[in-house]
Amino acid sequence: MEVNIFGLTATALFIIIPTSFLLILYVKTASNQSV
């Protein structure tokens, strides 16, 4: 159970962190193009 939860957490972080980073870059680029 604990190992599975840890694995799911690590996987979630691996997915969320790069995704949020790409979203931030996309928003900055979009806002720069708009202005």
From Swiss-Prot:
GO biological process: photosynthesis, light reaction
Keywords: Chloroplast, Membrane, Photosynthesis, Photosystem II, Plastid, Reaction center, Thylakoid, Transmembrane, Transmembrane helix
Protein name: Photosystem II reaction center protein M
Source domain of life: Eukaryota
Protein localization: Plastid, Chloroplast thylakoid membrane
InterPro entries listed in its UniProt record: PSII_PsbM (IPR007826), PSII_PsbM_sf (IPR037269)
Keyword Transmembrane attached: yes
Segments passing through the bilayer: 5-25
Family: Belongs to the PsbM family.
Chain's role: One of the components of the core complex of photosystem II (PSII). PSII is a light-driven water:plastoquinone oxidoreductase that uses light energy to abstract electrons from H(2)O, generating O(2) and a proton gradient subsequently used for ATP formation. It consists of a core antenna complex that captures photons, and an electron transfer chain that converts photonic excitation into a charge separation. This subunit is found at the monomer-monomer interface.
Species in which this protein is naturally found: Tetradesmus obliquus (Green alga)
Any one Pfam family match given in the protein's UniProt record, by short name: PsbM
Keyword check for DNA-binding: no
Topology within the bilayer: Single-pass membrane protein
Complex and partners: PSII is composed of 1 copy each of membrane proteins PsbA, PsbB, PsbC, PsbD, PsbE, PsbF, PsbH, PsbI, PsbJ, PsbK, PsbL, PsbM, PsbT, PsbX, PsbY, PsbZ, Psb30/Ycf12, at least 3 peripheral proteins of the oxygen-evolving complex and a large number of cofactors. It forms dimeric complexes.
